[in-house]
């Protein structure tokens, strides 16, 4: 049995990727930087870049993160790895060991007893290392701010690069924080932090 030809026009499937709602084209399709790269590659067959640009590009595309889930925010952190959000498509893959990680996500209430463990794990991470503070409890103590046993913000123990607000913050908020971290790495470079 042969397929029957349709009398109407054939509609191509929508392009994949993030589309600009104003133009309907993929985001970055008319970015001058990418147009310059495309022209240089088609003209010369290779692309010239500085070592710092190459290292920064590689680092932002392969950030390995480890969890330091202390409370309910860790559930949202797990959700960002699931198929709906799939943070790995942005090059953000989980690791179990701090020695293999570039990013640590602190999610939840940090107590005085847990603070030395947090610092020890942070010190085991290779340079350059980044920390995302996720949720009100990690950012400033949250609901337990006035408790005698709570550290009022994990920035008192380790330096924080990105703060993700919320109680608990949504998976979208964490994903946005990851994208902000990648933007920060691109802006500051990697050779010198």
UniProtKB/Swiss-Prot annotation:
GO terms for cellular component: plasma membrane; respiratory chain complex I. It holds the Pfam family Oxidored_q6. Its main location: membrane. It comes from the Bacteria. Signal peptide: none annotated. GO terms for molecular function: 4 iron, 4 sulfur cluster binding; iron ion binding; NADH dehydrogenase (ubiquinone) activity; NADH:ubiquinone reductase (non-electrogenic) activity; quinone binding. [4Fe-4S] cluster binds at residues 72-73, 137, 167. Binds 1 [4Fe-4S] cluster. Keywords: 4Fe-4S, Cell inner membrane, Cell membrane, Iron, Iron-sulfur, Membrane, Metal-binding, NAD, Quinone, Translocase, Transport, Ubiquinone. InterPro entries: NADH_UbQ_OxRdtase-like_20kDa (IPR006137), NADH_UQ_OxRdtase_20Kd_su (IPR006138). PROSITE patterns: COMPLEX1_20K. It is found in: Cell inner membrane. Its EC number is 7.1.1.-. Its cofactor is [4Fe-4S] cluster. It is a peripheral membrane protein. It catalyses: a quinone + NADH + 5 H(+)(in) = a quinol + NAD(+) + 4 H(+)(out). One of its GO terms (biological process) is electron transport coupled proton transport. NDH-1 is composed of 14 different subunits. Subunits NuoB, C, D, E, F, and G constitute the peripheral sector of the complex. NDH-1 shuttles electrons from NADH, via FMN and iron-sulfur (Fe-S) centers, to quinones in the respiratory chain. The immediate electron acceptor for the enzyme in this species is believed to be ubiquinone. Couples the redox reaction to proton translocation (for every two electrons transferred, four hydrogen ions are translocated across the cytoplasmic membrane), and thus conserves the redox energy in a proton gradient. HAMAP family: NDH1_NuoB. Belongs to the complex I 20 kDa subunit family. PANTHER family: NADH DEHYDROGENASE, NADH DEHYDROGENASE [UBIQUINONE] IRON-SULFUR PROTEIN 7, MITOCHONDRIAL. This is NADH-quinone oxidoreductase subunit B. It comes from Bradyrhizobium sp. (strain ORS 278). The gene is nuoB.
